[in-house]
């Protein structure tokens, strides 16, 4: 799936403008940050569609679906409480699964149990360590463990692509997956911390938007064989 049109620059500029407003608003504690947040991923989705030349391939449709699920998660997390948080995380999880199906379908070809068993053990250990570090407990422990494993699979799909597939675009995928994990870890830290830090909201958005952009750029430049 390659970028086919240079007209993507126009919606990309709108996306960058909205991203700047959101990040600046988060830094200053302004309400406008929440106002523009639901528009961010739709603008990125439009950029993706224009760059790809339309939604005529399954890969493009999966990529755009992941972005729109991100928009759903963004919107739900504007509200406080247990159910908006769970709904937002569920939307993001479904988006991650779209990304995993998009990238892992290529980078995991030929993997057997000799690869998957140690990989899953390592990923499980990393998730357990992060969960313990952040201090997740109670009813959210199991859901967050599942969510963490999905993030590890996303990272693994990018890492596998870097070492097994041709093209520098896989580095974009890996970087996007790592930034997504860092951003989500900050969301968990903010949620479960008794004294959230003022710098966290803006940092979440910077890393999150960079992650979404890198995953989109990687997908658009990966040549499917």
PLM features per residue range, with description:
Residues 1-225:
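Polytopic alpha-helical membrane-helix bundles and their juxtamembrane interface segments
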């Amino acid at each position: 799936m390659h970028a086919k049109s240079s007209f993507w620059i126009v919606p990309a500029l709108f996306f960058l403008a909205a991203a700047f407003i959101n990040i600046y608003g988060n830094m200053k504690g302004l309400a406008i940050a929440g106002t523009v947040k639901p528009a961010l991923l739709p603008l990125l989705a439009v950029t993706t569609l224009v760059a790809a030349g339309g939604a005529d391939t399954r890969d493009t449709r999966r990529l755009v679906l992941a972005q729109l699920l991100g928009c759903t998660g963004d919107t739900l997390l504007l509200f406080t409480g247990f159910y908006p948080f769970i709904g937002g995380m569920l939307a993001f999880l479904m988006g991650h699964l779209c990304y995993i199906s998009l990238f892992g379908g290529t980078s995991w070809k030929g993997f057997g149990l000799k690869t998957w068993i140690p990989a899953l053990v390592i990923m499980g250990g990393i998730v357990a360590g992060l969960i313990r570090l952040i201090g997740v407990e109670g009813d959210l422990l199991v859901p967050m463990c599942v969510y963490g494993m999905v993030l590890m699979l996303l990272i693994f799909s990018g890492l596998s692509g870097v070492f097994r597939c041709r093209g520098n675009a896989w580095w974009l995928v890996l970087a996007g997956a790592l930034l997504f994990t860092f951003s989500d870890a900050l969301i968990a830290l903010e949620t479960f911390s008794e004294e959230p830090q003022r710098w966290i909201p803006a940092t979440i958005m910077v890393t999150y938007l960079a992650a979404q952009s890198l995953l989109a750029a990687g997908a658009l430049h990966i040549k499917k064989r």
